[in-house]
Structures are given as C-alpha cells and as structure tokens.
Amino acid sequence: MTLETIEIETAPKPNAAVIWLHGLGADGHDFEPVVPQIVRRGERAWRFIFPHAPHRPVTLNGGMSMRAWYDILGLDRTAAEDTAGFRATDAEIRQLIERETGRGIPAARVVLAGFSQGGAVSLYTALRYPERLAGVMALSCYLPLPGRLSTERAPANDGAMIFMAHGLADAMLPIALGLASRDTLKSLGYAVEWHQYPMAHSVVEAEILHLREFLLRVLP
C-alpha cells in the first residue's frame, strides 16, 4: 500500500527531503505549520513529506480504529510490541524513501522525523535502512523493539545523526522511556543529540529552533 502524503517544497527543485511522521490519532496535517518555522521559503530547497498513517484497531484504545503506525498493546516497558505492525510500516516508509531517490534525492539527503508513534517508527526504519540517511529526529518517543536492534541494525547507519527530544512533564510517554532509549542507543555505539524541555507530550518553540539547527547541519 502506498501511503497518502502531503508535500511542501520550500524552493523549486528540492535537493533534500524530510519525511515526518505524525503521532497516534493525528494525521499528516499535524506538523505542516512547523515548516515555515524551521526553514524560510527559499532559504533551502527541501521537500517536507507528511504521510497519513492508515486506520487500524488500537488495543490501548479499546480496539477502536484510528490512524496509527502500529498497534499499541501497553505503555509499560515490559508490554509486548507489535512487531508485525512495525515491519509493515517500515516497508511503507522505505517506499517513501525510494520514491525520493527516484525523484533525484539520494538517501544521504533524506531525514526521517516523527513525533510519538511516528518518532518510534523513524528510529526503527532509520537504524535498519541499508543506505546511509542524513539523520533522524525522534520527538517525544521511545526506541521500539530494542532487543532486536543489535542483530537487525544496518552498518550504513551506524554513524547516523540522531536528534532526540522529550518533555519533562510528559505524562503520556514519561521522559524515563526517552532516557532509557537514549541510553540503549548510546550503549550500542550510536551518537545521540539529546534535548529535554519543560513541556508535556507536545512540541515547543525552543525545540523547533533546535530542530532547525539540526536540519541545517545535516542538510547543508
């Protein structure tokens, strides 16, 4: 299945792409407003791609159907994870990356980004993708299926530029989950740029400024 997407180009003939995944229950429109805050029109020739997650039943939501990248069985660190859901979504995100390479943007000029569920997927795909990516921005999320990463990781992205951010007052995904994920990544040799902010499960202006700095650095 090809995901429906929203695209914003900041200048003609984009030479880089940012594929940005929304959180649980949201859609691709959720992060459209951040584009002009991150890059001024004409400053860089970037293509922002905001896919819509498909609708699926979510166990944590009483089995109700909503836009989700994978099923959530529980928020406890010991809860089972939807391995099949991650793999299916991973295949869809890879299609988006390959669509960009087909349009002339090499994988090394592609950043994967995401918030909450979308951030977890971005980490999952970026660290397993067989070609070097420009980086990954994982916001208010966690590292999924950490026990599998050591055997499934792609050497091409061992040096991946990873931006992680979390809210100190996040009651939905407590910052302890983000910190544990950061520490796991570091223990596996990944370099993580970590930021934390006095916010809940959201995004704040200071974070957007740091995202801008990160993107300007990895997509010069």
Where are these regions (language model features)?
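Serine-hydrolase catalytic machinery in alpha/beta-hydrolase-like enzymes
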Residues: M1-V111
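Alpha/beta-hydrolase fold active-site loops
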Residues: A16, A160-M161
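Short alpha-helix in the alpha/beta-hydrolase fold that links the catalytic acid
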Residues: F31-P36, S150, P174-T184
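Short, conserved loop/helix-junction motifs that constitute active-site signature segments
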Residues: R40-E43, R153-G159
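Alpha/beta-hydrolase-fold catalytic nucleophile elbow
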Residues: H52, A113, L139-S140, A165, ...
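Primarily recognizes the serine-hydrolase "nucleophile elbow" in alpha/beta-hydrolase
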Residues: P106-N157
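Short beta-strand/loop motif that positions the catalytic acidic residue
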Residues: F163-H166, D170
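C-terminal catalytic histidine-bearing segment of alpha/beta-hydrolase fold enzymes
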Residues: A176-P220
